[in-house]
């Protein structure tokens, strides 16, 4: 972890390793790790973990996953800079699950997150990916019962994800024992510092074993984050995934003006013949909407399948398998799974609801034309959505035109 500032590059440094001198331009780190493994099968993951990865719906690693999973598994300290929504959570979750020993009932990995919601989200991802591994992941967050927290930690969770204040409290009370800890991961480090958790982060760090591996993920690299990396890490591997690795190139984007929300359903039904030419993914913003739309379409005798985070893992696995094999042609889902559905055949994406944040737009539709395939994206836009549509156009420097009548010819 910690090391003197002037240490030169490690002798066995990977390609392009440049020690600890972080060259920063515009708040970006400079990568010193070039290896890209763009297939989960080639990462030498445990069989049960690989099963969990595919069951979750991942097909191919995202840019950050293809670069960062392996160095973390190898035990390097790693700084990864990537925008939110690029698959960072699964990056460290997969690496952690590969490194821990499920037979040891003690905390082996600690993940700190800036908010309770993010901590709980990470917990869900770890549990889902580790579904076949018999591991326990506990969320150690404020606003919950301290006694219950202590009891849970006593039961021997191998992974703890939490907010800095509560984690520090638990370690201090000796409820969270760190003697078996080998990995410390800071997610959204920039956000953590901007929320004033710096002192608490350092306090937690001081209580960890000296040789703990440290992994830090951040969308931006302000000076404060770099100071953290200097204090916590030795010869870190640095990985930068620029925003433009996710591209809208080759994807034709259209909008359909829908006068009011209630009319979207009829619009979709009118498009259904077009939709089923190939496979399509339809995105809604809430799980409830997914269920509602599925019911409505089914009652009109359209064949669709649906998937969201409330479903059992086994159920999601079956749906994903059917969709991948092509036996189900239309999948309705939420953003939770937007990043996992890399299905090669998908050439049409419909945003029944525009995403509630613009970053998710590229995760939904970038999928349609991934890996050099062409794709079409159709956005349903009510008068309330016009501003968001313009915002998306500006953010991605792209143009979204009104859908032509011959859209079927373009798919």
Curated annotation (Swiss-Prot):
ATP-dependent RNA helicase which is a subunit of the eIF4F complex involved in cap recognition and is required for mRNA binding to ribosome. In the current model of translation initiation, eIF4A unwinds RNA secondary structures in the 5'-UTR of mRNAs which is necessary to allow efficient binding of the small ribosomal subunit, and subsequent scanning for the initiator codon. A motif (DEAD box) lies at residues 187-190. PANTHER family: ATP-DEPENDENT RNA HELICASE DBP3. The keyword Protein biosynthesis applies. This is ATP-dependent RNA helicase eIF4A. One of its GO terms (molecular function) is ATP binding. Residues 250-411 form the Helicase C-terminal domain. It comes from the Eukaryota. It comes from Mycosarcoma maydis. ATP binds at residues 82-89. GO terms for cellular component: cytoplasmic stress granule. It catalyses: ATP + H2O = ADP + phosphate + H(+). Keywords: ATP-binding, Cytoplasm, Helicase, Hydrolase, Initiation factor, Nucleotide-binding, Protein biosynthesis, RNA-binding. The Q motif is unique to and characteristic of the DEAD box family of RNA helicases and controls ATP binding and hydrolysis. Residues 9-19 have a biased composition (Low complexity). It is found in: Cytoplasm. Component of the eIF4F complex, which composition varies with external and internal environmental conditions. It is composed of at least eIF4A, eIF4E and eIF4G. InterPro entries: DEAD/DEAH_box_helicase_dom, EIF4A_DEADc, Helicase_ATP-bd, Helicase_C-like, P-loop_NTPase, RNA_helicase_DEAD_Q_motif. Belongs to the DEAD box helicase family. eIF4A subfamily. One of its GO terms (biological process) is cytoplasmic translational initiation. Residues 1-23 are annotated as: Disordered. A motif (Q motif) lies at residues 38-66. The gene is TIF1. Residues 69-239 form the Helicase ATP-binding domain. Its main location: cytoplasm. Signal peptide: none annotated. Its EC number is 3.6.4.13. The keyword Zinc-finger does not apply.
